[in-house]
Amino acid sequence: MTSAATTSDVVHARAPGKINVSLTVGALQEDGYHDVATAYQAVGLYEDVWATKADGFSVEFGGSIDTSHLTTGADNLAVRAARLLARSTGYRGGVHLRIEKNVPIAGGMGGGSADAAATLLACDTLWGTERTRDQLLALGAELGADVPFALAGGTAIGTGRGDRLSPALAKGTFQWVLAIAEFGVSTPDVYGELDKHRERHAQDIFPAQQIPQVDSGVLQALRAGDPHMLAEVLHNDLQAPALHLAPGLGEVLQLGEENGALAGIVSGSGPTVAFLAADLDSALELQIALSAARLTVIRATGPVHGARIITG
């Protein structure tokens, strides 16, 4: 994450999407939320934001995916990010945002959070508000649990709501093949289904942890840079409820593993399915096989850096 004051009229910032290689969800809290423990990995699918000074706050979308159903009003997360930065710094102007989206929408990969992260960085540079890294991370946490990680990038452990970050060592590059669904899944619906599942099976499963933790095997696999080790410990507590709400994802998981994936996992709350491949050649072969099965497929590598200024 890099930021500096500028005299440019336009600032271009970029932030990555993410995969949760491990996601453990704690018990339902009184406020209706859950604490989590997750291992994030930033992957090379990017959201690009161009920020231009303006009197008010506005946003428009473009890019490789259909954005026609996205809101461009005050409730858009990128607009909220810009307004939050202006309010917290006393900046009296506005901004027009142009966002090119390449991270699947409502796919569990943090595309909206990447928009917000890139917007914070772009506006901080455009306006010369000169927030520190920690200040930007704190603002990001006000916007959503995944925003701080989109700012930080790399590989990290997220606790609390996922916004309290600790860097994690990760050696080498992991090869991912992403099967993109033609539909979205509501994150609140997936968490709600998880709570119902736990209530229905309270006699048969261990109680949810009050303070969830990432399994040590995940950290060891990341440190080793070994995709075979990581494949053995991929974990997502939200996968079962996501499969319940979207049963077709189970067929996608099976298809990927039948065509050479080391393992597959629903990314976050879904419905994107992330397959881990042994190496680049295996990833290419898997991409071809899934494409032949008429799935929309993207290949990506991780970890990659977090939000940064491209020009400005």
Curated annotation (Swiss-Prot):
Similarity comment text for this entry: Belongs to the GHMP kinase family. IspE subfamily.
Residues bound to ATP: P104, I105, A106, G107, G108, M109, G110, G111, G112, S113, A114
InterPro entries, A to Z: GHMP_kinase_C_dom, GHMP_kinase_C_sf, GHMP_kinase_N_dom, IspE, Ribosomal_Su5_D2-typ_SF, Ribsml_uS5_D2-typ_fold_subgr
Catalytic activities: 4-CDP-2-C-methyl-D-erythritol + ATP = 4-CDP-2-C-methyl-D-erythritol 2-phosphate + ADP + H(+)
Gene3D superfamilies listed in its UniProt record: 3.30.230.10, GHMP kinase, C-terminal domain
Protein name, as recorded: 4-diphosphocytidyl-2-C-methyl-D-erythritol kinase
UniProt KW Transferase keyword: yes
Gene for this chain: ispE
Single biological process term from Gene Ontology: terpenoid biosynthetic process
Record pathway: Isoprenoid biosynthesis; isopentenyl diphosphate biosynthesis via DXP pathway; isopentenyl diphosphate from 1-deoxy-D-xylulose 5-phosphate: step 3/6
EC number(s) reported in the record: 2.7.1.148
Assigned keywords, A-Z: ATP-binding, Isoprene biosynthesis, Kinase, Nucleotide-binding, Transferase
EC class (word): transferase
Endpoints of the signal sequence: none
Function: Catalyzes the phosphorylation of the position 2 hydroxy group of 4-diphosphocytidyl-2C-methyl-D-erythritol.
Molecular functions per Gene Ontology: 4-(cytidine 5'-diphospho)-2-C-methyl-D-erythritol kinase activity; ATP binding
Keyword flag Mitochondrion: no
Superkingdom, natural source: Bacteria
Pfam families per UniProt: GHMP_kinases_C (PF08544), GHMP_kinases_N (PF00288)
Active site: K18, D146
